């Protein structure tokens, strides 16, 4: 004999029909059906009321929630998300609170978690693949603590616009404030980058240091890691700082900005380079003025950044100054200097520049450009780049310096 199949609805109907006969007491009915008296008195009034579908489960949700988000606030949250499609709940909350402060309307906005729930219900949140964190390796460059203490510079990976034009976006950010100083399509050569930097320096001023990778045109494998571009930085009094090779995590703030730049301006690319540059200009304004950053206390970069105090010098740059105990040599066009009757190769990036040569405790001679040590000329007259740690140079009294061509 097969088992009798039943359901909660069928059991409720049978319970009330048996109760209607008057044969069983309430206690007996509850024992027969395996329910409590409290459950019986939940269903009995519904059966008596004559409701058409009294036997169905009802929603247990509260009829009214006094702390539910006002519909107008939810609509405003959704509108901000549609305007800034890459803003998450925290940025939306910060942006709305800043807007309320400017207007002085005193609106209280819900928590970021509630905003996230509102966006999910509106179908505005897509599940994202979790990114595996990279393991940091090597020496990490110390972070900047004040605006213009250090800028970061790099090229965002090149791509082509719809008409086939190649775009190489040069990006510059301030490390401390995250301020996006420039996004400009330039020729990826030292001359192209120098021209773009001259415009920036002349417009807003210069930082104390610039952080970059050691690739062309920012650095090289030559003496001191210098390139023609970083030699120019040193002459301007800007310290070149290089992250270790294959260590983009040491420039993580800049790389994170690149992800946002790509998502909001080049997916898909514009029709032409001119139109793409317009997108970059619009993104720069939005990134600096509208987009809150969690690391900045949900403030926009423009609220923290201020123009540099150092101005771009006009006219020809002067040669570096060296202590009196240095022999000064002019680097020839092919990268050599004349040292004790022989030509010693230093580096083509320094062609035409003055370098200083001073005695070293090891018996050799240390070579430097400005305040950057380049290497050591050994007793065999060979130049060794990136020499081992060395003793501090002796500081002599100031005296006239002669230049040997």
Where does each model-flagged region fall?
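Mobile genetic element proteins and their domesticated derivatives, centered on retroelements
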Residues: 15, 29-30, 40-43, 51, ...
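Mobile-element integrase/transposase regions
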Residues: 68, 113, 117-174, 179, ...
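Short, amphipathic alpha-helical "recognition" segments used to contact nucleic acids or chromatin
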Residues: 7-24, 74, 78-83
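C-terminal, beta-rich DNA-binding module of retroviral/retroelements integrases
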Residues: 288-405
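Acidic/histidine-rich, metal-coordinating catalytic segments
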Residues: 188, 202-222, 244-246, 251, ...
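Charged alpha-helix within mobile-element recombinases
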Residues: 222, 228-314, 356, 360-361
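Short, Lys/Arg-enriched anionic-surface-contact patches
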Residues: 1-14, 63-71
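Basic, flexible linker segments flanking DNA-binding modules
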Residues: 45, 51-152, 158, 227, ...
């Amino acid at each position: 004999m097969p088992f009798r199949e039943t359901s909660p609805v069928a059991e409720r109907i049978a319970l009330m029909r048996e109760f209607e006969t008057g044969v069983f007491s309430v206690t007996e009915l509850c024992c027969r059906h395996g329910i409590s008296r409290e459950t019986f008195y939940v269903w009995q009034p519904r059966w008596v009321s004559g409701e058409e579908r009294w036997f169905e489960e009802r929603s247990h949700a509260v009829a009214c929630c006094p702390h539910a988000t006002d519909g107008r606030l939810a609509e405003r949250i959704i509108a901000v998300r549609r305007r800034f499609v890459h803003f998450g709940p925290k940025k939306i909350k910060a942006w709305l609170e800043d807007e309320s402060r400017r207007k002085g309307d005193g609106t209280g906005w819900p928590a970021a978690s509630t905003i996230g729930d509102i966006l999910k219900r509106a179908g505005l949140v897509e599940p994202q693949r979790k990114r595996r964190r990279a393991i940091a390796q090597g020496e990490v460059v110390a972070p900047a603590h004040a605006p213009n203490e250090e800028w970061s510079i790099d090229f965002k990976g090149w791509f082509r616009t719809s008409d086939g034009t190649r775009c190489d976006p040069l990006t510059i950010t301030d490390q401390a404030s995250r301020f996006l100083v420039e996004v400009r399509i330039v020729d990826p050569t030292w001359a192209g980058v120098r021209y773009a930097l001259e415009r920036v320096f002349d417009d807003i001023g210069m930082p104390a240091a610039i952080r970059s990778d050691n690739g062309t045109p920012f650095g090289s494998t030559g003496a001191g890691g210098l390139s023609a571009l970083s030699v120019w930085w040193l002459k301007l009094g800007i310290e070149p700082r290089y992250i270790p090779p294959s260590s983009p995590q040491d420039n993580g703030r800049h790389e994170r900005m690149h992800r946002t730049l790509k998502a909001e301006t080049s997916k898909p690319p514009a029709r032409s380079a001119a139109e793409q540059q317009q997108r970059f200009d619009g993104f720069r304004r939005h990134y600096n003025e509208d987009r809150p950053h969690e690391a900045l206390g949900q403030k926009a970069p423009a609220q923290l950044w201020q123009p540099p105090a150092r101005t771009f010098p006009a006219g020809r740059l002067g040669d570096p100054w060296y202590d009196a105990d240095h022999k000064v040599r002019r680097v020839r066009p092919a990268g050599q200097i004349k040292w004790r009757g022989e030509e010693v190769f230093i580096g083509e990036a320094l062609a035409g520049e003055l370098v200083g040569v001073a005695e070293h405790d090891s018996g050799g001679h240390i070579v430097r450009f400005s305040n950057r040590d380049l290497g050591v000329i050994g007793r065999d007259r060979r130049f060794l780049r990136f020499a081992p740690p060395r003793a501090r140079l002796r500081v002599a009294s100031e005296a006239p310096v002669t230049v040997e061509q």
